[in-house]
Design a protein with these regions (language model features):
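Compositionally biased amphipathic helical and low-complexity segments enriched in hydrophobic
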Residues: 5-8, 57, 119, 168, ...
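Beta-strand-rich solenoid/repeat architectures in extracellular/passenger domains
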Residues: 14, 27-42, 54-68, 80-95, ...
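Gram-negative bacterial Sec-dependent N-terminal signal peptides
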Residues: 1-15
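Glycine-rich beta-solenoid repeat tracts in large extracellular/virion proteins
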Residues: 16-24, 44-50, 70-77, 97-104, ...
Length: 300
């Protein structure tokens, strides 16, 4: 095992620290205020190979300017990357990814007040793209993107958010929260989550295949745009079953022509609401709650 320790480093806004590329079986540990700046298409700021472990202290900052770049990526199985509080990741470029698990059984974890900002089309804020993997955020996480704030595409994988998360997308056909795995996966939010989506045919919470998205109390979902959905459970193939649950005090808004607050299209799937739920829509041909799949239901 090789260990690189860079502790109590003096912070400098003028001199960037080195990118981190942890080789197979290595352990890399850096202290607070570690700052990585990269320019160029296909760049990756922090990467972990098979069985590697990377730990960064508080207030780490990552900036990547270029198409198809990665801020943080697990590219080897059984790898782990962990941040302290106050991490910041900024991506500029098309098809960029802020944070992604790309290898099975890999995990990325953030402390409190992490923020990911992406500028460019076809981008992803946090992406769990491998099986048996996870990305976890502490309280007060913020993700701002054009195309997709968080997606889970690997089976038996999870994205987990602490209290008061704020996720926002601003592009047409954008998905703020996207669960696309075939089986066994989930996205969970603690109290006070805020989901915003502003764009034509955008979706606040999209369950494409199977799995569950769950919110605790006081969740807010707001979408604005023609043909937008606050929540959409799609009937993607025969036999997929999906579920969305809310705690008490949820507020769901959809504004625009033919907009839907909640639409459950998948068969035998469920939308479950706690007490004091408010669903409000505006716009011609807009709908508050609709169920299109055989056996689908709402629990109020």
């Amino acid at each position: 095992v090789v260990t690189l320790a860079v502790l109590s480093m003096p912070f400098s806004a003028n001199a960037a620290d080195a990118p981190i590329n942890a080789g197979a079986g290595t352990t890399v540990t850096v202290g607070d205020n570690y700052e990585i700046e990269m320019t160029g298409n296909g760049s990756t700021a922090v990467a972990a190979a098979q069985n590697a472990n990377v730990t960064l202290g508080n207030d780490a900052k990552i900036t990547v300017d270029g198409d198809s770049g990665y801020g943080v990526q697990t590219n080897g199985e059984n790898s782990k990357i962990e941040f302290g509080d106050g991490a910041g990741i900024e991506m500029t470029g098309n098809a960029a990814v802020g944070v992604e698990t790309s290898a099975d059984n890999s995990h990325i974890k953030f402390g409190e007040s992490a923020e990911i900002v992406l500028q460019g089309d076809y981008n992803y804020g946090a992406s769990v793209w491998s099986e048996n993997s996870s990305i976890e955020f502490g309280a007060d996480a913020k993700i701002t993107a054009v195309s997709n704030a968080v997606r889970v595409g690997g089976n038996d994988s999870q994205a987990i958010f602490g209290a008061d998360a704020i996720l926002t997308t601003s592009g047409d056909n954008a998905y703020t929260v996207h669960l696309g795995a075939a089986s066994g996966s989930s996205i969970t939010f603690d109290n006070g989550a805020v989901i915003n989506s502003d764009g034509h045919a955008s979706i606040g919470v999209f369950i494409e295949r199977s799995g569950e998205v769950s919110f605790k109390d006081q969740a807010e979902i707001k979408v604005t745009g023609d043909f937008a959905y606050g929540v959409y459970l799609q009937n993607q193939y025969d036999g997929n079953v999906s579920k969305i649950t809310f705690g008490d005090g949820a507020q769901i808004e959809a504004h625009g022509y033919n907009a839907d607050g909640i639409h459950v299209e998948a068969e035998n799937s469920t939308a479950e609401f706690g007490d004091d739920t408010v669903i409000s829509v505006s716009g011609e041909d807009s709908t508050g709650v609709s169920f299109g799949g055989a056996g689908s239901k709402g629990v109020f």
